């Protein structure tokens, strides 16, 4: 194990392995977000079984994604990958006619060195439909980084300039066109994206576009000097591509998760545009007051993050502000530059609440974590699904980290949903005690 101390924050790295949900699961929310897209996952039967089980798709639902299943002939190079992928893409175009086809590479395509990036432009010319290639394999990426690779690939497809006609129309309709363009990146449900747009509009800031957009044909314009701001902590690759390739200016802000994070996010964007934020104190205080029934349940309770979805730092920061004690933040991967503002806010909250700084363990060793959980006996462990039942059997209340990925947790109004998830096992324990039960399982399990 290696440890690096930065001021009062201690970063540790254990095994170097990822113990997370598979990153190809990003298909679950991205195909719903980009309405005119089709996702083609190129992998083995294992990938297909995972998608069927993890996404819970009905047989007759006909979702806008599919599996291109690799067979022995593909792996031994007896079949022509180019011809097979061309046939599949032609079939997709005929059946669905999407505006874009997204190829999702998996562990197997990485191991057998399939040249997806080389084949895609040729097939794109043949079928006259854009093909975006994203390598979302579990060898190189953790759970939510699948979305990061897709968005990073889509950055290259964003237009650089707007046509003269549409520009003149836009100027005539928008008198505030003097504001530098602001593009937000990260996939959110339309309702949540609208809430964040509205919060910024109240401060006099207009959002020029979102990456990804609701439709592929509406991707935002990215010119040199465009301001960009992320809404999720796992999008560091996308942020890097936006800065290096498109010369955009990244706004380094905490992420809009919880009322404290949302306020800090808005304040940072306002400061970049030289705008004095209005009524944010009252807005945040109203939200905290509305959460009081949940806060009474979590104050003084302890929580341990095993690490899965890269939302751990933001969630821990919010829970510390709620009055909880965080023993450890396990996280599969962390870009310290991209999350610098989030880490600073975490440290500030720890000082304000007079609680010790949690350990931050990158790529944690699950065996060591289990030993630490056994010693610390936290009130709650937020963990991947694989460890939930074994921990419950040992008397540790758990919550699946994957639930925070699929829940609506961004913005002022959705803070309640975070606490609803966190307090569910705590409320269950209170209900059991009311019935005279001490636990759900037999004691003395070793």
From Swiss-Prot:
Task: Please list every transmembrane segment annotated in the UniProt record, as residue ranges.
Answer: none
UniProt-listed GO biological process terms: light-independent chlorophyll biosynthetic process; photosynthesis, dark reaction
Q: Which GO terms describe its cellular component?
A: chloroplast
What is said about its interaction partners and assembly? Protochlorophyllide reductase is composed of three subunits; ChlL, ChlN and ChlB. Forms a heterotetramer of two ChlB and two ChlN subunits.
Against InterPro entries, the record matches this protein to: LIPOR_BchN/ChlN, Nase/OxRdtase_comp1, Protochl_reductN
> Per the annotation, how and in what number is the cofactor bound?
Binds 1 [4Fe-4S] cluster per heterodimer. The cluster is bound at the heterodimer interface by residues from both subunits.
Which residues of this UniProt protein bind [4Fe-4S] cluster?
Answer: 22, 47, 107
CDD domains assigned to the protein according to its UniProt record, in alphabetical order: Pchlide_reductase_N
Catalytic activity entry: chlorophyllide a + oxidized 2[4Fe-4S]-[ferredoxin] + 2 ADP + 2 phosphate = protochlorophyllide a + reduced 2[4Fe-4S]-[ferredoxin] + 2 ATP + 2 H2O
Q: Which gene encodes it?
A: chlN
Q: What is the lineage of its organism?
A: Eukaryota, Viridiplantae, Streptophyta, Mesostigmatophyceae, Mesostigmatales
Extract one GO molecular function annotation from the record: oxidoreductase activity, acting on the CH-CH group of donors, iron-sulfur protein as acceptor
Q: To which species is this protein native?
A: Mesostigma viride
This protein's pathway = Porphyrin-containing compound metabolism; chlorophyll biosynthesis (light-independent)
Q: Where in the cell is it found?
A: Plastid, Chloroplast
Requisite cofactors: [4Fe-4S] cluster
Sorted alphabetically, the keyword list is: 4Fe-4S, ATP-binding, Chlorophyll biosynthesis, Chloroplast, Iron, Iron-sulfur, Metal-binding, Nucleotide-binding, Oxidoreductase, Photosynthesis, Plastid
Q: What is its main location?
A: plastid
Asked whether the UniProt record includes Electron transport among its keywords, one would answer no
Entry protein name? Light-independent protochlorophyllide reductase subunit N
């Amino acid at each position: 194990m290696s440890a690096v101390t930065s001021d009062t924050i201690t970063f540790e790295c254990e095994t170097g392995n990822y113990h997370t949900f598979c990153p190809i699961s990003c298909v679950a929310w991205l195909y719903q977000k980009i309405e005119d897209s089709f996702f083609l996952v190129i992998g083995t039967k294992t990938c297909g079984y995972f998608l069927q089980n993890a996404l819970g798709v009905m047989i007759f639902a006909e979702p806008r994604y599919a599996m291109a299943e690799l067979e022995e002939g593909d792996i031994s190079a007896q079949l022509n990958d180019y011809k097979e992928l061309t046939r599949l893409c032609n079939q997709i175009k005929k059946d669905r006619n999407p505006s874009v086809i997204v190829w999702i590479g998996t562990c197997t395509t990485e191991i057998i060195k399939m040249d997806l990036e080389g084949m895609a432009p040729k097939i794109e010319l043949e079928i006259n439909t854009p093909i975006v290639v994203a390598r979302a394999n579990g060898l190189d990426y953790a759970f939510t980084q699948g979305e990061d690779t897709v968005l990073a690939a889509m950055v290259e497809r964003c237009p650089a300039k707007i046509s003269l006609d549409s520009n003149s129309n836009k100027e005539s309709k928008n008198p505030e066109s003097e504001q530098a363009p602001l593009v937000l990146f990260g996939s959110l449900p339309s309702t949540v994206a609208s809430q964040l747009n509205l919060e910024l509009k109240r401060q006099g800031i207009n959002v020029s576009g979102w990456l990804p957009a609701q439709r592929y044909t509406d991707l935002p314009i990215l010119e040199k000097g465009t301001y960009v701001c992320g809404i999720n902590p796992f999008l560091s690759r996308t942020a890097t591509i936006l800065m290096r390739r498109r010369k955009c200016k990244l706004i380094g802000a905490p992420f809009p998760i919880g009322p404290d994070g949302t306020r800090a996010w808005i304040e940072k964007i306002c400061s970049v545009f030289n705008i004095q934020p209005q009524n944010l104190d009252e807005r945040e205080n109203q939200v905290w007051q509305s959460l009081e029934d949940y806060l009474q349940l979590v104050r003084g309770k302890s929580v341990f993050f095993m690490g899965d979805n890269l939302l751990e730092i933001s969630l821990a920061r919010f829970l510390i502000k709620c009055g909880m004690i965080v023993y450890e933040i396990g996280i599969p991967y962390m870009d310290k530059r991209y999350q610098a503002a989030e880490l600073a806010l975490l440290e500030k909250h720890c000082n304000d609440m007079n609680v010790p700084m949690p350990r931050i363990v990158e790529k944690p060793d699950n065996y060591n974590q289990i030993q630490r959980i056994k010693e610390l006996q936290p009130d709650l462990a937020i963990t991947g699904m694989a460890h939930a039942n074994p921990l419950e059997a040992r008397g540790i209340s758990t919550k699946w980290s994957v639930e925070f990925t699929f829940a609506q947790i961004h913005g002022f109004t959705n803070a309640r949903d975070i606490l609803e998830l966190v307090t569910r096992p705590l409320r269950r324990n209170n209900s059991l005690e009311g019935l005279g039960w001490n636990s759900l399982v037999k004691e003395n399990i070793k």
